Swiss-Prot record:
PANTHER family in the cross-refs: TRANSCRIPTIONAL REPRESSOR PROTEIN YY, YY2 TRANSCRIPTION FACTOR
Gene: brlA
Name of the molecule in the record: C2H2 type master regulator of conidiophore development brlA
Species this protein is from: Penicillium oxalicum (strain 114-2 / CGMCC 5302) (Penicillium decumbens)
Residue ranges, compositional bias (Low complexity): 30-48
Role, per record: BrlA, abaA and wetA are pivotal regulators of conidiophore development and conidium maturation. They act individually and together to regulate their own expression and that of numerous other sporulation-specific genes. Binds promoters of target genes at brlA response elements (BREs) containing the conserved sequence 5'-(C/A)(A/G)AGGG(G/A)-3'. Regulates the expression levels of seven secondary metabolism gene clusters including a down-regulated cluster putatively involved in the biosynthesis of the mycotoxins roquefortine C and meleagrin. Negatively regulates the expression of cellulase genes.
Keyword presence, Protein biosynthesis: no
Record keywords, A-Z: Activator, Conidiation, DNA-binding, Metal-binding, Nucleus, Repeat, Sporulation, Transcription, Transcription regulation, Zinc, Zinc-finger
Entries under SUPFAM superfamilies matching the protein: beta-beta-alpha zinc fingers
Amino acid sequence: MRTQGQQISDRLTVEVDCHSLGPADCPSMTSSFSPLESPTPTPTSLYSHGSLTSPSWHEAGHYHSLPMERRPSGTPLRNAFRVTDFPSADPMGMQVGTMERPDQLPVSSEYLSGYDDINDQLWIPHDSIPKTFEHPTFPYQAPMPQYHHTMGRNHYYRPQAHTAYLPESASNPCLSRPMFSRHDGLSHSASMSNMLPWMTAPESLAPQTITPQQAFPGAGPVTPPSSNYSDFPASLQTFKPHTPSTPVRSLSLGTPRSDTPQSRMSGHYDYSEEYPVSPVYRDGHLIRTHRQPSRKPSKKQLVRSNLSLEKLPPIIKQVQFKCKEPGCKGRFKRQEHLKRHMKSHSKEKPHVCWVPGCHRAFSRSDNLNAHYTKTHSKRGGRNRYVATLDETSPDYDPEFRGQLTPDGRPIYGSKLEDLADCDLSVDGWED
């Protein structure tokens, strides 16, 4: 066994008690391997809190890059894992071994299901254990595991079981302290190698080496940043946000347009209204494109070009029938309308009002009927009221011809010739 005086900050000692065998039979059972190379990336602080009982160990006959040999034996072994008291690099100066932890954990088929026979001896060569990350400033930094597709029998990957025991600072390398230290002695490629497995799902990509130039093209060499956040790598500013190049049309008019692919897709070739195209961003630069006026005339222009005074039909047609009386400007569309108008200019008025005291004559019968309804059917007018011409009166009888009472009611049985004072002179007639 190694002494506790040695500064072994990344070793986990495996002690195997062989009570039934002699010391010469199992000289190589006491060995040490790095927990950083285990399939579960568990930091030192995780083992100090008694979380060793839960990691899912490989159920195959070998670890990746860690060969094992099986030596059959007839005597059963009582194997146990023991966490030794090794100093931690925590700034608080706390010893890991002084914290509460299980002293012994029996190794059974539950943890090493690849070994069905518990009588076999587990031997790990001391020279085959890789020695990585022995720098004293990386007590909590653990490389992300690289899972190979050539696993042994009964092995399957359980990602939820691994992430349940990892704190946020261990699973996310961007939050660990050594990445922001300028004295850590690591280059930018080493930091990027720890970030890339965390950024990519392990089950979706095969293990491969990705350089920073392949992951971030055009960024150039970047030096490790300092502890303050103001000196963050300037290469992140080279990443430009992606903006859609599809133009958005506005409703303003009067802007010239050009024959662009966007205009071909829109299909607005037959209109003269111009729609400006929104700015297009290409490689982070603003590119303004304007449309030029199309040469094809629009529909409105074609309609306006056909409108002229010579081609327009007359709004009012020329009236063919005119009144021939001098001084009369009567115009009529029909011949019968002109004949009826000509009767108004003649001296013949055969249609005379029968109301006693009126005796007004008209050349047309329709004019006489209008005279009855407008003048004699209303009370309080300057003409005499006749109840037989009023539609609202109970004595309404448009066919009555006879004598009337002073209030305009009819006197049935009387005749118009019986009136002695009836004046039928022509002077009383009105045109």
